[in-house]
Amino acid sequence: MYPCSNPELVAAVSAAGGIGVLQPISLTYVHGHDFREGIRLMHELSGGKPLGMNALIEASSKTYRERMERWVDIALEEGVRFFVTSLGKPGWVVERVHAVGGLVYHDVTERKWADKGADSGVDGLIAVNRRAGGHAGGRSARELFDELADVGLPLICAGGIGDERAFVEALEIGYAGVQMGTRFIATEECRASQPYKQAILDAGEDDIVHTERITGVPVAVIRTPYIERMGLEAGPLARWMLRGRRRKHWMRTIYALRSLWQLKKASLDESGSKDYWQAGKSVAGIHAIEPAGEIVRRFAAAGRSISESPFPAVERPRDLRPGAG
């Protein structure tokens, strides 16, 4: 959840019984922590509850790949046993994590990526649907579940989960759980700016648009006057650069570096003057800034209210406590 996953938020989610997922670039670049010390801080704040780590594993840069490998190794040394991978082949992460008894779930938006993840040995899939913030998929939650159900792995619903009703609907479809981003930005612990949080509270589904101006591919953001002035499509030079194989590599690197700065600045800027605010359609169900733990507990209570599911139960994952293996 770059750039909003600060240590206090991640720890609060875990302390309440969820799995707070740290984002290493957010932890180090946005919030200024040494990676290892940041993990130790989150363990301390959460009371030693399980933490997860997001490993964006696209291999466009050798330097970035080496840094991500080091981050994964440090996280494992510090007892992290749950990893969410995205944008690449997760095999090397799976090998390292399974060696110590951990679990790897992989972000997917369609069947071909799910099959590649399964072939790499991942333990579950994060099914990113078209209601998600950031880089959303193209299918509804139900369509994606139906497409992935026979892969044979637990499925987590990502996108559109802003209130208990949406959470229960995901479980009733057959998902083993949900992943939430936008809902946790509008919390007391999140360090995102007040204008960003207020924009989430004020937005409806129709206020979520997809812009190519940040990363070169569509990203779900809140429609604002700034977004409307900038437009939603990448410029002609960028589109040309993204078409060639070699040019595409360099253009995506430029976009990645620029977007890190843009999103960091926009998320922390209290003036809201240049507001690239990532969010999904779950904004429709978010009406208050609340403690993260209260949200987790309320959703858990709603989940327990489902007395009987028409779908077979999914086997509970292995123990994810720090150090468990």
Q: Where do the language-model regions lie?
A:
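Active-site entrance/lid segments in N-terminal catalytic domains of soluble metabolic enzymes
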Residues: 1-154
